[in-house]
Each structure stands twice: as structure tokens, then as C-alpha cells.
């Protein structure tokens, strides 16, 4: 018992010896709380400023390329409205101050330039009251607006709003675009990903894309994964590999050796990765067309791959799942020349395909590292 007591004392003494040894200034809890609030407000404002930039590019990409999304389209007007209640709980205490929101009515925090909402005269700061006589709810506002537009389609929307205390009536004429959500995720890594249900653009991408044309290439690339059916094709390739591996596993099992599905699992992964680099090249190619069709001048936008090489130096030489950054830079230069030639000759701006486009897949696999 005495030995154990000395062991505890020795352990405490050793921990104390390893503790910080400087005499730090004392911080007031109130000062920390005040600084925390300042940073929370700044972060939320920055997020929605970045989201506005992404939404502007995404709106144009979706609207200009609706034909490639086949039946997966919906009506859109190009605005975002929020209330403190419609945001996650952790933002409620400061979102009204950060974004100048109202609790009693949804406040418009973003209007895409050139969108139906902008054309109708809706402005940032307007307070929405009703769409075609239906009150706009103060909870789940973005989802409600999206659902209303899916049901309403391209029919005009009479919007009643309040601006500076004065009620106004405006008519918005929606446009139809690709329905896939394009969301902003806070993540410093410059990356983007897509699955058949959504596209995710990480905040690091907005940091490294110096122009909206560069950002449009990234969004177009991710949309290309979906419209070209890459996820579906990878799943089929994986199933083929898995089937072959199952045959090998079964052969070993007949000989009394249990492999634990080793060959099935390995060949499934190999099958899914078989054309990964080719799919990425195709998404770059198709995405360049999508960006151009949306009105972006992509000449020089291939520089995004030189910037990416600074962030991910391994991409300069390694091409395990994606082309190298030099290949992607040079490919986009050639695609830009191809598009420019078509524009000069008055030809349709559609990618040159070997076969008809595939429908969006139903698997949930993601294409990462754009």
C-alpha cells in the first residue's frame, strides 16, 4: 500500500515538472466571450459571402446545361432567404446580428446576378412574406422555397415582400436548370466531390480559384461526373471485378482454402478504379464545355491546375486516380482551343462524345479530389 502511495506521489511530481512554466496574463471570461462572438459573426458572414459566389456560378452552370441533366431538372429563381430559426442551433444566438436577419420574416441574404429574382427586382435585405399567396415559413425556409418551385415549375411567382417597412408585390419568372444541389462545405483543403445526389465544393476551392471562370471549371467538372454516369459505370466495373474475384475465391474454397473474400474484395476495388483517370479527364473535358455554355471565358482558367500543384505537389507527378496537374493544364488548353474554334465557326457547344450520355446513377459512391 505504501509503495502504491509513493508511486502516485512520484507521478504527480513528474506531471508537475512537465507543466508550462511561464507566467501568462489572465484572460477575462467576458473578454473571451466577446472575442468569440466577433469571430463567430465574422465566420458566418464570410461563409455566406463565399456561398453567394458559389451559388452565382452554380446557378449559371445548372441553367445553361439543363439538357444534359435530362429529366433531373427543376425550376429555380436564384435567391437565398433565411431566418435565425432556419439555421442550425449553434448559429441562432448571433446569426441575426451577423446577417441582419429578422425573426418574424425570412430575409433575403443572397440574390444571384442575372437570375429571375434579380430581374424581378428582389434585393438583398428584402423580407419575404408570401409566394402566390402562400406564407413563406420562418423555419426550413430554403427547403420550403425549393419545394414550392419544384411544384410550381416555370409558372410566374407573385412575391409579396417588405422593403424598408413598405410592402411590395413583384412577379418572378423561374427558369429550369439541373436539379442537383451544389453545396459549400467548410474545409480548407481545396477539393470538390460529387455523387448522384449532390455536389460538394470545399471552401478551400474558393480560396485558390482566382476567377469565377476557374471556379466554373470545377463546378462543371463535378457536374460532368454526374451527367456522364461515371458513378454508375464505376459501380458496374466493380461488380464485374467482384464477380471474377468470387469465382477465384470459390475455386480456392473447393480446394479447402478459405480466402475470406480476398480476391472478391480486391478485384471489386480494382474494377472500380479501372478507368478512374480516364473518367477524370472526361469530366475536365465536359466541364470546360459546361462552363463556356454558362457564359464564362475559360481562356487562361487552366491556371487553376498550376495553383493546385502548389497545394498538392504530388499531383505534379503521380496519377493513381487522377491525371497529373501538368496533363490537366495542357488538356484544358487544347479543349479551350477546340471550343474557341467551334465558337468561331458557329457550331453547337457540345462535347464530342463517343456514345450518348448516361443517366445519372443511383449509387452513392463519390468522385473525390476533382
Predicted regions and their residues:
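Short helix/loop segments within enzyme catalytic domains
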Residues: 21-75, 162-166, 256-317
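Catalytic Zn2+-binding segment of zinc metalloproteases
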Residues: 205, 210-214, 223-239, 296
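Conserved PDZ fold ligand-binding element
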Residues: 117-141
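PDZ/PDZ-like peptide-tail recognition elements
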Residues: 46-106, 171-173, 177-188
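PDZ-domain C-terminal substructure recognizer with occasional recognition of PDZ-binding tails
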Residues: 144-183, 258
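Post-HEXXH active-site segment of zinc metalloproteases
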Residues: 230-261, 302-305
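Active-site-proximal gating segments in proteases and membrane effectors
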Residues: 71-85, 187-190, 242-245, 268, ...
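C-terminal motif of bacterial Sec signal peptides marking the signal peptidase cleavage site
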Residues: 14-17
Amino acid at each position: 500500500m505504501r509503495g502504491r502511495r509513493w508511486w502516485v506521489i512520484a507521478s504527480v511530481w513528474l506531471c508537475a515538472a512537465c507543466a508550462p512554466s511561464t507566467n501568462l496574463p489572465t484572460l477575462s471570461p467576458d473578454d473571451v466571450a466577446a472575442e468569440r462572438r466577433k469571430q463567430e459573426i465574422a465566420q458566418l458572414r464570410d461563409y455566406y459571402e463565399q456561398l453567394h459566389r458559389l451559388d452565382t456560378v452554380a446557378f449559371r452552370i445548372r441553367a445553361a446545361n439543363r439538357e444534359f441533366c435530362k429529366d433531373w431538372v427543376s425550376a429555380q429563381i436564384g435567391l437565398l432567404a433565411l431566418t435565425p430559426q432556419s439555421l442550425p442551433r449553434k448559429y441562432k444566438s448571433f446569426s441575426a446580428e451577423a446577417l441582419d436577419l429578422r425573426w418574424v420574416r425570412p430575409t433575403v441574404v443572397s440574390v444571384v446576378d442575372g437570375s429571375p429574382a434579380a430581374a424581378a427586382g428582389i434585393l438583398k435585405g428584402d423580407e419575404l412574406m408570401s409566394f402566390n399567396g402562400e406564407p413563406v415559413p420562418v423555419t426550413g425556409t430554403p427547403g420550403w422555397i425549393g419545394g414550392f418551385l419544384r411544384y410550381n415549375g416555370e409558372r410566374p411567382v407573385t412575391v409579396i415582400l417588405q422593403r424598408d417597412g413598405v410592402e411590395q408585390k413583384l412577379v418572378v419568372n423561374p427558369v429550369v436548370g439541373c436539379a442537383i444541389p451544389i453545396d459549400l462545405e467548410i474545409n480548407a483543403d481545396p477539393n470538390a466531390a460529387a455523387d448522384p445526389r449532390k455536389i460538394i465544393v470545399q471552401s478551400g476551392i474558393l480560396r485558390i480559384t482566382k476567377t469565377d471562370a476557374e471556379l466554373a471549371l470545377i463546378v462543371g467538372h463535378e457536374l460532368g461526373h454526374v451527367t456522364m454516369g461515371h458513378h454508375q459505370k464505376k459501380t458496374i466495373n466493380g461488380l464485374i471485378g467482384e464477380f471474377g474475384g468470387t469465382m477465384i475465391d470459390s475455386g480456392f474454397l473447393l480446394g479447402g482454402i478459405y480466402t475470406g473474400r480476398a480476391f472478391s474484395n480486391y478485384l471489386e476495388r480494382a474494377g472500380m478504379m479501372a478507368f478512374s483517370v480516364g473518367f477524370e479527364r472526361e469530366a475536365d473535358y465536359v466541364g470546360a464545355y459546361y462552363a463556356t455554355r454558362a457564359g464564362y471565358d475559360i481562356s487562361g482558367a487552366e491556371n487553376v491546375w498550376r495553383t493546385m500543384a502548389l497545394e498538392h505537389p504530388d499531383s505534379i507527378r503521380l496519377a493513381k486516380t487522377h491525371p497529373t496537374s501538368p496533363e490537366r493544364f495542357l488538356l484544358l488548353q487544347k479543349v479551350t482551343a477546340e471550343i474557341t474554334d467551334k465558337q468561331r465557326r458557329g457550331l453547337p457547344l457540345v462535347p464530342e462524345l463517343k456514345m450518348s450520355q448516361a443517366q445519372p446513377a443511383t449509387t452513392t459512391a463519390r468522385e473525390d479530389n476533382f
